[in-house]
Amino acid sequence: MSGSCVRLRSVLLALVLILPGASIAQDAPPPGDEALAASIVQKADLVRFPAEGFEMTVTINTTTADGPADTRKYRVLSKGNENTVVMTTEPASERGQILLMKGHDLWMFLPSVSQPVRLPLAQRLTGAVANGDLARANFAGDYTAQLLRTEKIDGEATYVLELTAVDRTVTYHRVLYWVRQANFWPQKAEFYSLSERLLKTCLYQKFEKMAGRVRPMRLTMLDALRADEESTLEYADMRMRDLPDKIFTKDYLKRLE
């Protein structure tokens, strides 16, 4: 009798191990696993942008229900997710304006002003785009991540994470972040204010190979406070560059073209 029980238990165990549902349950991430959540955000950061030095151009188009589209273009130099230079190239009336980010510190340099102006990352740059959306993309360094759940978007299994700001210098107080499980591609983000008000939703789109791996080359920002306003960021000409640290200094900016 006991031998039969042992054999039955062995058969049941084998069935559990090979059932698809059991495999999914084993692979399902435990909610609240901080180490796993941090790893997911780090990997998604590397999908969005290289960790090494790189250059790219960004075109931002903003549309509203009652006005013509506004188009602005920028040249971006970035290194290590902590140092960024953003140069305005269009419109011509703003050409020569430069943003310099070092860590969480951001300055704007204007051709007509001798001293740089300190700016917050959360301040609006244009349309639904904040300074930090363009100058800083270091979610892993700016937020503490918690894995909330998994769900599907367009049939793709995704992690759903809650990102909480490490301090008040970062662009947003809280972010809900959807990342595809199969390849850590970011899918969507919702950005919230300190008062927990939804500010905007970002959709990561147009995945193409650029600078060594497949990345989202278009971001669509949907303004939650201005329902008729939408901004798209189109990335182009992304390439790796050896950028010396001296580029990311106030004294060097006048030499940039």
Question: Where are the model-predicted features located?
Answer:
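Bacterial N-terminal signal peptides that target proteins for export
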Residues: M1-L12
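Bacterial N-terminal signal peptides
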Residues: S10-G21
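Boundary at the C-terminal end of the N-terminal hydrophobic targeting segment
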Residues: S23-D27
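N-terminal mature ectodomain segment of secretory-pathway/periplasmic proteins
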Residues: G32, A37-S112
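A short, amphipathic edge element
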Residues: A38-S39, R136-L147, E196-T201
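Solvent-exposed coil/turn segments that connect beta secondary-structure elements
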Residues: N61, K79-N81, T89-P91, H104, ...
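Acidic/charged, solvent-exposed loop-and-adjacent secondary-structure segments enriched in E/D, K/R, S/T
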Residues: L110-R136
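Gly/Pro-enriched, hydrophobic low-complexity segments
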Residues: Q115-R118, N138, E156-D251
